């Protein structure tokens, strides 16, 4: 079993890379891919860069060059659930684009043409993540809808508009749905795991800078615990 792991920023992958053994590195199109062992599993970790295009490029290259059996997207997110605090975790129950609108052609809001409205993570990856929750200590984790768009959300007016379209949204970020869409195209199972760095409000720019390292660590910890729970035979 080989697992691809993608984070957008250095703090979101640094703890994973530091914990790897037998690591080798290859750079393609300016993106570094680090292959090795993590939590007893063969993994390939990469920092994609920020946004949906960067994430799509990195995901496609990782799948084409390394043929992973599953993909994990890790990192930070803005939170929309009152019971979660900064540093807590959202495991994707589904992933959607929040900034796509081709409803004029009969699609749902957030649904890209010729794509599903929601991308559903692999059950065995979500199951492994849920088993890992018990080992998180004081860090809380829930399953929920994660929405993706090419904007950092810190405007309450925009937040309310997003919640009108996606009332069950638990978190928003800038890469997950793009990674999920590429995985859907290639038939690669995926899950998105995000730790909250802010609450998608006016304080978000300050909170993000203050808490990105904490969020990156918690998300990386969750990924490593997930890998420990993952059954090598439970793929595809």
Swiss-Prot record:
GO terms for molecular function: adenosylhomocysteine nucleosidase activity; methylthioadenosine nucleosidase activity. Keywords: Amino-acid biosynthesis, Hydrolase, Methionine biosynthesis. The active site is at 12 (proton acceptor), 198 (proton donor). Its EC number is 3.2.2.9. InterPro entries: MTA_SAH_Nsdase, Nucleoside_phosphorylase_d, Nucleoside_phosphorylase_sf. It holds the Pfam family PNP_UDP_1. One of its GO terms (cellular component) is cytosol. It is an enzyme of class 3 (hydrolase). Pathway: Amino-acid biosynthesis; L-methionine biosynthesis via salvage pathway; S-methyl-5-thio-alpha-D-ribose 1-phosphate from S-methyl-5'-thioadenosine (hydrolase route): step 1/2. It comes from the Bacteria. CDD domains: MTAN. Substrate binds at residues 78, 153, 174-175. GO terms for biological process: L-methionine salvage from methylthioadenosine; L-methionine salvage from S-adenosylmethionine; nucleoside catabolic process. It catalyses: S-adenosyl-L-homocysteine + H2O = S-(5-deoxy-D-ribos-5-yl)-L-homocysteine + adenine; S-methyl-5'-thioadenosine + H2O = 5-(methylsulfanyl)-D-ribose + adenine; 5'-deoxyadenosine + H2O = 5-deoxy-D-ribose + adenine. Gene3D superfamilies: Nucleoside phosphorylase domain. Transmembrane segments: none annotated. Catalyzes the irreversible cleavage of the glycosidic bond in both 5'-methylthioadenosine (MTA) and S-adenosylhomocysteine (SAH/AdoHcy) to adenine and the corresponding thioribose, 5'-methylthioribose and S-ribosylhomocysteine, respectively. Also cleaves 5'-deoxyadenosine, a toxic by-product of radical S-adenosylmethionine (SAM) enzymes, into 5-deoxyribose and adenine. NCBIfam families: MTA_SAH-Nsdase, PRK05584.1. Belongs to the PNP/UDP phosphorylase family. MtnN subfamily. This is 5'-methylthioadenosine/S-adenosylhomocysteine nucleosidase. It comes from Shewanella baltica (strain OS155 / ATCC BAA-1091). The gene is mtnN.
């Amino acid at each position: 079993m080989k697992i691809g792991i993608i984070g957008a920023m250095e703090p979101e992958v640094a703890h994973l890379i530091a914990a790897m053994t037998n690591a080798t590195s290859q750079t393609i199109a300016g993106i570094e891919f680090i292959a090795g062992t993590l939590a007893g599993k063969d993994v390939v970790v990469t920092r994609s860069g920020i946004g949906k295009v960067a994430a799509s490029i990195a995901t496609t290259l990782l799948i084409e060059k390394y043929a992973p059996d599953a993909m994990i997207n890790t990192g930070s997110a803005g939170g929309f659930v009152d019971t979660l605090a900064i540093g807590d975790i959202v495991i994707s129950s589904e992933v959607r684009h929040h900034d796509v609108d081709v409803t004029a052609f009969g699609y749902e809001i957030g649904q890209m043409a010729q794509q599903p409205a929601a991308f559903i993570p692999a059950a065995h990856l979500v199951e492994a993540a849920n088993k890992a929750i018990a080992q998180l200590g004081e860090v809380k984790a829930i399953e929920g809808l994660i929405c993706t768009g090419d904007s950092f959300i810190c405007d309450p007016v925009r937040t309310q508009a997003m919640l009108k379209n996606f009332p069950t949204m638990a978190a928003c970020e800038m890469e997950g749905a793009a990674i999920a869409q590429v995985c859907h195209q290639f038939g690669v199972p995926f899950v998105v795991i995000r730790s909250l760095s802010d609450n998608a409000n006016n304080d978000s720019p300050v909170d993000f800078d203050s808490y990105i390292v904490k969020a990156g660590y918690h998300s990386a910890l969750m990924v490593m615990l997930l890998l420990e729970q993952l059954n090598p035979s439970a793929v595809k």
